[in-house]
């Protein structure tokens, strides 16, 4: 930290280091994203042992293409952040300019800056959504969805690209209150009411069991099944082979 402080005219570094007595700053890295410089600080703080009372003891969440996140209580989040009109306009402008010219280089820099803006927007929304999910439940159960493979097996590559599915999954996996079920659990097919297995096509949005006549939204059904499978196996011997506790 002191090395970067001496090398750069950082405003407010002294005030930052004195902000809290329980913060121990260890390292600082100077990062350049092609437009701006940032200082990334690594620090340690005392663990917060406060016990928070949350709305739900446990929820299951299903990640999907149609709805980004579906919770077992019926709450849905549909988030898509695509290319901005400003970016599209800049790309059209670039096509009409001579490659390597001053104007071309200026437009390229503006495009890079707009891409960074979109990335920051996606990160901000993902952080807020994950914080919201963690604040409403003591335990979150999700499945190890292979999001990248959805690009090859569906016609929704653009929608997946504009979503924040990967960011949500990655950020949730850092929490010790998130349980990740193996991808092979039949959360969509299985009827926890009677044990029947029913295969659904991607465009089938309702799960209706032909045996017990249970009828439920497909994604809510899958999210509830995640809780069901977790509760069935969490105390069994050999659970570590089928259940990933992050």
Stretches with model-predicted labels:
Residues 34-246:
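Positively charged, helix-rich recognition surfaces that bind polyanionic ligands
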Residues 1-31, 162:
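Acidic carboxylate diad motif detector
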């Amino acid at each position: 930290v002191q090395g970067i402080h001496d090398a750069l005219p950082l405003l407010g570094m002294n005030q930052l280091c004195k902000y809290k007595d329980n913060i121990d700053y260890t390292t600082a890295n100077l990062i350049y994203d092609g437009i701006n410089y940032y200082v990334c600080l690594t620090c340690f703080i005392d663990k917060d042992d406060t016990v928070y009372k949350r709305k739900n003891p446990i929820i299951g969440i299903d990640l999907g293409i149609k709805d980004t996140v579906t919770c077992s209580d019926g709450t849905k989040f549909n988030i898509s952040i695509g290319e901005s009109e400003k970016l599209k306009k800049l790309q059209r402008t670039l096509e009409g300019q001579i490659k390597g010219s001053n104007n071309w280089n200026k437009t390229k820099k503006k495009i890079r800056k707009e891409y960074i803006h979109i990335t920051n927007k996606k990160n901000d929304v993902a952080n807020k959504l994950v914080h919201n999910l963690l604040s409403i439940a003591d335990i979150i159960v999700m499945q190890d969805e292979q999001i990248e493979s959805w690009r090859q097996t569906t016609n929704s590559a653009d929608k997946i690209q504009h979503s924040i599915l990967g960011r949500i999954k990655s950020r949730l996996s850092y929490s010790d209150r998130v349980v990740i079920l193996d991808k092979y659990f039949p959360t969509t097919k299985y009827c926890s009411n009677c044990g029947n297995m029913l295969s659904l096509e991607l465009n089938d949005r309702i799960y209706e069991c032909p045996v017990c006549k249970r009828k439920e939204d497909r994604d809510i059904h899958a999210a509830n099944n995640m809780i069901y499978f977790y509760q069935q196996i969490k105390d069994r011997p050999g659970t570590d082979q089928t259940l990933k506790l992050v």
